[in-house]
C-alpha cells in the first residue's frame, strides 16, 4: 500500500509542476482571391489575379506565473507562429518574454509588442492579404527585442519601452517608445509614439498615434489619427518623408453575428519623389459568425486605391475562413 502511494505521489509531481502553465492558441485559415491593377497614363498594366489557401495567423503559446510572495509574481510567455500551411517555423517568433509583476506594475524582457502595436484595436481584421486589413496605417507596428515597463492603471499612464542598439536587427537603430491609455464607462483614449534614430535609410524616424472610441457590450467604434515623419540619410532625396493618416472602424454584435466596417485615408505628404502621390483610400467590410465561444466563420472584402487620376494602383480582395481558439 505504501509503495502504491509513493508511486502515485511521484506520478503526480509533473502535473503539479505544470499546474501554472497555460497552453493556448488559435488555428485559422481560409481562401482568399484578389485582383490588382496599376494604371499608368491611359493604360492599365501589371494586372495580377490570385486565389490561394491561406493561413490567417495561426499561433500556439505557453504562459505561466509563479507567486514569489509579498505580492510579487514571476511571469513568462513563449508564443510562436503555427501556420497550418506549414510556411513558418521557429520558437518565440511572436510575443515571448520573462518578467516580474506586482503593485508597481510589470517589467518584461523579450520579444514584446511595441506600445504602438497595442493600440491597434481599430484594425481587427484577420487575413493574409495586405488589402484585407488596414495595413498601411498599421505598418509601423512591430515586435521588438526590448525591455518594457507597464504601470498599474493610474493617471492614464501605461508603458515605456526601450530597444537597445544591438537588438534592433541589421539596421542597428535604438528606439524609444511610450504611451498611455484612459478608459471610463466604455469610452477610451489611447496614445502611443516612438522615436528611432540612426537606421540605414533614416537619420531620425518618429510616429505618433491617437485613438479614441467606445467599446462596451455589443458596440465598438473608434477613430485613429497617425502622423509619421522621417529624416532621410540619402543626400539625393528630400530631407523628410512624412504622412498623416486616419482610420475609423465600427462593429455591432447581433446575437452570433458581428458585422464590421473600416475606412482609412492617407493624406498627401512629402516623399522622396515629388511626383509620387502617396495618398490612398481603403475600405474593408466583413462579418463573423460564432458557432460557439471558440469557433467562428469569417468573411471579408477589401478595396484599396493608391494615387489618383491616370497614375494609380487599385486592388480588390475577398476572403472566407474558419477560426478556432483553444
From Swiss-Prot:
InterPro entries reported for this sequence: Gram-neg_bact_OMP, Gram_neg_porin_domain, Porin_dom_sf, Porin_Gram-ve, Porin_Gram-ve_CS, Porin_Neis
Keywords: Cell outer membrane, Ion transport, Membrane, Porin, Signal, Transmembrane, Transmembrane beta strand, Transport
GO terms for cellular component: cell outer membrane; pore complex
One matching Pfam family: Porin_1
One annotated GO molecular function: porin activity
Signal peptide (from-to): 1-19
Membrane topology: Multi-pass membrane protein
Compartments where found: Cell outer membrane
Any GO BP: monoatomic ion transmembrane transport
Top-level taxon of origin: Bacteria
Subunit structure comment from the entry: Homotrimer.
Cited NCBIfam families: porin_porB_Neis (NF040479)
Protein name: Major outer membrane protein P.IA
This protein's encoding gene: porA
Amino acid at each position: 500500500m505504501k509503495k502504491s502511494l509513493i508511486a502515485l505521489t511521484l506520478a503526480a509531481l509533473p502535473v503539479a509542476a505544470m499546474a501554472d502553465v497555460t497552453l493556448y492558441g488559435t488555428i485559422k485559415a481560409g481562401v482568399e482571391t484578389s485582383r490588382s491593377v496599376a494604371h499608368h497614363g491611359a493604360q492599365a498594366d501589371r494586372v495580377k489575379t490570385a486565389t490561394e489557401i491561406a493561413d490567417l495567423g495561426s499561433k500556439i503559446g505557453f504562459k505561466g506565473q509563479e507567486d514569489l510572495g509579498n505580492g510579487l509574481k514571476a511571469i513568462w510567455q513563449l508564443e510562436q507562429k503555427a501556420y497550418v500551411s506549414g510556411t513558418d517555423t521557429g520558437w518565440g517568433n511572436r510575443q515571448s518574454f520573462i518578467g516580474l509583476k506586482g503593485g508597481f506594475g510589470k517589467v518584461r524582457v523579450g520579444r514584446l509588442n511595441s506600445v504602438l502595436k497595442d493600440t491597434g484595436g481599430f484594425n481587427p481584421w484577420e487575413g493574409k492579404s495586405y488589402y484585407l486589413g488596414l495595413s498601411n496605417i498599421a505598418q509601423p507596428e512591430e515586435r521588438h527585442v526590448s525591455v518594457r515597463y507597464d504601470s498599474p492603471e493610474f493617471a492614464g499612464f501605461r508603458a515605456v519601452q526601450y530597444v537597445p542598439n544591438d537588438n534592433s536587427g541589421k539596421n542597428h537603430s535604438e528606439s524609444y517608445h511610450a504611451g498611455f491609455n484612459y478608459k471610463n464607462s466604455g469610452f477610451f483614449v489611447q496614445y502611443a509614439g516612438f522615436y528611432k534614430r540612426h537606421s540605414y535609410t533614416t537619420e531620425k524616424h518618429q510616429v505618433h498615434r491617437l485613438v479614441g472610441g467606445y467599446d462596451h457590450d455589443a458596440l465598438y467604434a473608434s477613430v485613429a489619427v497617425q502622423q509619421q515623419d522621417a529624416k532621410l540619410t540619402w543626400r539625393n532625396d528630400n530631407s523628410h518623408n512624412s504622412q498623416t493618416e486616419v482610420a475609423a472602424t465600427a462593429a455591432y454584435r447581433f446575437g452570433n453575428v458581428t458585422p464590421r466596417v473600416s475606412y482609412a485615408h492617407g493624406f498627401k505628404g512629402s516623399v522622396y519623389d515629388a511626383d509620387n502621390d502617396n495618398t490612398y483610400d481603403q475600405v474593408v467590410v466583413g462579418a463573423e459568425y460564432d458557432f460557439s465561444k471558440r469557433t467562428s466563420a469569417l468573411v471579408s472584402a477589401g478595396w484599396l486605391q493608391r494615387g489618383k487620376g491616370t497614375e494609380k494602383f487599385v486592388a480588390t480582395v475577398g476572403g472566407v475562413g474558419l477560426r478556432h481558439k483553444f
